[in-house]
From Swiss-Prot:
This is Hydroxyethylthiazole kinase. Pathway: Cofactor biosynthesis; thiamine diphosphate biosynthesis; 4-methyl-5-(2-phosphoethyl)-thiazole from 5-(2-hydroxyethyl)-4-methylthiazole: step 1/1. It comes from Staphylococcus aureus (strain JH9). Catalyzes the phosphorylation of the hydroxyl group of 4-methyl-5-beta-hydroxyethylthiazole (THZ). The keyword Electron transport does not apply.
């Protein structure tokens, strides 16, 4: 857990432009791993913040016409500052409006990581793809989708699901940790986007090992939380997840990580 240990020592400032539903949970999750979250949204202060920040999360869960230009502006400011961006195109396939905005953002700024479920990433590479919501997934080939997205956007791809797929540096990794309860908590996937950002340390071309550790730390913590005798369902799972992120140690991490490199 080299990256998590570094986070716990250095408390990296992680800027989160995220959706209104998940701000509190995302901030608390980042605090639990040792990062310092800032839920800053004003383009007017971005230049100053981004000089000292370590990464920026952009999550479009509550995209509106009023915040479109702000998102483009902060992404471009992050590029100018050399700040890595984790982009979470929430429900991109649910509407033409979302898809058009995501395409515009990806043309207007360079992101370091695109993170979403298989349907969301498919919607970014296939104009005919649609989805029913943020958790839609129709038995898609996540590895193939991730590889194609990586080839198109030339950026790291993280696809979440029953198994998670990471493609970066022309490598494809499948991770098999996690808990079904993650799908029963609004904002769990959004928090993962923030966690990934917390692991980047101003690396605009992140090492695949940082991405593997970020996703695995989150999902192993979810497993441990779900197995806790005090976990009775989604309501008790959420705080236990935060507690487990806070306490996770190297022994548990190494014993539980399930990882496979694929062709």
């Amino acid at each position: 857990m080299n990256y998590l240990n570094k986070i716990r020592i250095e408390n990296p400032l992680t800027i989160c432009y995220t959706n209104d539903v998940v701000k509190n949970f995302t901030a608390n999750g980042l605090l639990s791993i040792g990062a310092s979250p800032a839920m800053s949204e004003a383009p007017e202060e971005a230049e100053e913040f981004y000089k000292v920040a370590q990464a920026l999360l952009i999550n479009i869960g509550t995209l509106t016409a009023q915040n479109e230009q702000d998102i483009i502006a902060i992404a471009q400011t992050a590029n100018e500052a050399g700040l890595p961006i984790v982009f979470d195109p929430v429900a991109v396939g649910a509407s033409t409006y979302r898809k058009q905005f995501c395409k515009l953002l990806l043309k207007s700024a360079k992101v370091s990581v695109i993170k979403g479920n298989a349907s969301e990433i498919l919607a970014l590479i296939d104009d005919t793809a649609t989805m029913k919501g943020t958790d839609s997934d129709a038995n898609l080939d996540a590895v193939a989708i991730a590889k194609k997205a990586y080839a198109i956007y030339k950026t790291a791809i993280v696809i979440t699901g029953k198994e998670d797929v990471i493609v970066q540096d022309n490598k494809a990794i499948v991770l098999a940790n996690g808990s079904p309860l993650l799908a029963r908590v609004t904002g769990a996937g959004c928090l993962l986007g923030g966690v990934i950002a917390g692991f980047l340390f101003r690396e605009t071309e992140p090492d695949i090992e940082a991405l593997i550790e970020a996703v695995s730390v989150f999902n192993i913590a979810a497993e441990v939380a779900a197995e806790n005798e005090n976990c009775g369902g989604p309501g008790t799972f959420s705080p236990l997840l935060l507690d487990t992120l806070y306490h996770l140690n190297e022994t548990t991490y190494q014993q539980r990580i399930r990882i496979q490199e694929v062709e």
